Design a protein with these regions (language model features):
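N-terminal glycine-rich anion-binding loops that anchor highly charged ligand groups
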Residues: 3-18, 23-42, 46, 52-54, ...
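Conserved, mostly hydrophobic/aromatic
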Residues: 17, 78, 146, 189, ...
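Short, glycine-rich nucleotide/cofactor-binding loops
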Residues: 22-24, 227, 231, 327-329, ...
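N-terminal amphipathic alpha-helix/helix-capping segment at the start of soluble metabolic enzymes
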Residues: 1-19, 134-140, 276-334
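Structured loop/turn residues at secondary-structure junctions
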Residues: 22-23, 51, 81, 194, ...
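Active-site beta->alpha loop and helix N-cap motifs at the rims of alpha/beta catalytic domains
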Residues: 28, 43-174, 306, 312, ...
Length: 487
């Protein structure tokens, strides 16, 4: 736990919500007004930029007047480039954030090979530049955030590690080790990037590296320059939400190019969802010892190719195919076909590759055959979710490739085998919808089925598991049973 003023960060404390003022810090009245409005909106930690020593000095009056107005939220100074500004700011606010990429380094974009001794000399220089701030923070009881930015890594880091998540992590850990050498541990780390995929990998790697080194510093999560409107909220939700779902993150900020108080409701929603996930996890009786996903490298799961059409295949290194559910269905097959064709005309680059419809009874078979013929080769695959008996299913007709979506439970081995072989015989594909328990029980049978006519899916998350966790567990079962059907 790191105390930022009276606000505890990390440990069993709630996930804290942060934001940042957008005013000129030297305009004390305007900055104070934003701090007050943020506090009233529910912001728990407020960050203020201090680009120079004059701005850092202005923090004294801002802090005094903020407290005089009756607000207790801690203030944080955001420092780039100038150690002198950091030394001034630490006197007035509860926390100082520094960027290890530019705190003691000027960006020269120089290409240089560092020998081990030359690199060690650079670290000695860092130690000398950062130590005064660490010692003053320790003396005053302040906290520091080591905040790496993907876009501002130092030349030293770039030349040794490249423009990578590993470089981001190592950049922060260099400063952490300096702080620890002085017995200072009131640190928070962040690994921000404008690319959610980069920041997700960097935070996961930071957590893994800290675990290896017996470190447990809190993490502040954020996507830099997310933008505005719905796109910015989605971008932040992808980055921050993915990490919160991993159990990572102690404070968050959703960075919007809007008035800063608009960030708070978005943060609150993300925190609420993370809290619900955490509560579900505590109450779940389903626990798995190891996550099969590799957090630090991306590779596609090898799988057998499934042919929807001459130009559309699924599995292995093919593009991930997108299946959409018809909003109309078989009750009006002509309108359902028109809906797809109109979508193709409006968005020629975004074609429907698979259309999902329900076939609840034999009464709709004629409509299914008509829809299939109407779609022809326009839609490569027609996914048909059904509960009708195998003997009644209409494999006849022409048009889109038929993919039968059928649920199977533990003990349905014979039915599964019959459906799979009948689909293969009729040039159709079976999409077996199974839960984790069923996948375990049916694994031996699944391993005997023709993989080129088989897809594995699940539409119902296992109790106590998020949908992602359910799919990962099913894939683990498939891999252990050497079943390479696409998922």
């Amino acid at each position: 736990v790191v105390n930022v003023g009276h606000v505890g960060v990390g440990g069993n404390n709630p996930i804290r919500v942060q934001s940042m003022t957008t005013t000129d810090t030297e305009d004390v009245a305007a900055t104070l007004a934003q701090c007050i409005k943020l506090a009233e909106a529910g912001c728990e930690i407020i960050r203020i930029t201090a680009p120079n020593k004059a701005a850092a000095a202005a923090l004294k009056k801002i802090h005094q007047e903020f407290r005089a107005a009756g607000f207790s939220q801690p203030l944080v100074a955001d420092i780039h480039f100038l150690p002198q500004a950091a030394m001034e700011a630490i006197e007035h606010v509860e926390k100082v954030r520094i960027n290890p990429g530019n705190y003691a380094d000027k960006k020269k974009f120089a290409v240089r090979e560092y020998t081990d001794s030359a690199y060690a000399e650079e670290l000695d220089r860092l130690h000398e530049a950062f130590t005064p701030l660490v010692l003053r923070a320790k003396a005053l009881g302040r906290a520091l955030r080591i905040g790496t930015n993907h876009g501002s890594l130092s030349d030293r880091i770039m030349n040794r590690y490249g423009d990578t998540p590993l470089g981001m992590v190592e950049s922060a850990l260099e400063f952490v080790r300096i702080a620890e050498s002085h017995g200072f541990k009131d640190l928070v780390l962040s690994m921000k990037s404008s690319n959610p995929k980069v920041m997700i990998e960097a935070y996961r790697l930071a957590a893994a590296r800290m675990a290896e080194s017996a470190m447990d510093y809190p993490l502040h999560l954020g996507v830099t320059e997310a933008g505005e409107g719905e796109d910015a909220r989605i971008k932040s939700a992808i980055g921050i939400g993915s990490l919160l779902a991993d159990g990572l993150g102690d404070t968050i900020r959703v960075s919007l190019t809007e008035d800063p108080w608009h960030e708070i409701p978005v943060c609150r929603e993300l925190v609420a969802r993370a809290d619900r996930l955490a509560e579900n996890g505590k109450n779940s009786s389903t626990h798995y010892s190891r996550d099969p996903a590799d957090s630090f490298s991306y590779s596609r799961r090898p799988s057998t190719l499934v042919q929807f059409s001459n130009k559309c295949r699924a599995g292995s290194n093919e593009l991930v195919r997108v299946v959409v559910r018809s909003t109309i269905g078989l009750k009006d097959w002509q309108a359902a076909a028109k809906e797809v064709l109109d979508a193709h005309n409006q968005q020629r680059e975004a074609r429907v590759e698979g259309l999902l419809v329900d076939l609840p009874s034999t009464e709709s078979i004629k409509d299914l055959l008509s829809l299939r013929k109407a779609l022809g080769q326009t839609v490569p695959a027609l996914f048909v979710q059904t509960t009708i008996p195998l003997s009644d299913f209409p494999f006849i007709g022409e048009g889109s490739k038929i993919v039968v979506v059928k649920s199977f439970s533990a003990g349905d081995d014979i039915e599964l085998k019959n459906w799979a072989h009948t689909c293969a015989k009729n040039q159709a594909i079976l999409a077996a919808d199974v839960e984790v328990v069923a996948a375990t029980a049916l694994a031996k049978t699944l391993a005997t089925l023709p993989p080129e006519n088989l897809i594995i899916s699940t539409q119902k998350p296992t109790a106590g598991l998020h949908a992602i966790g359910t799919y990962r567990e099913i894939i683990r079962i498939l891999n252990e049973s050497k079943i390479d059907a696409p998922v």
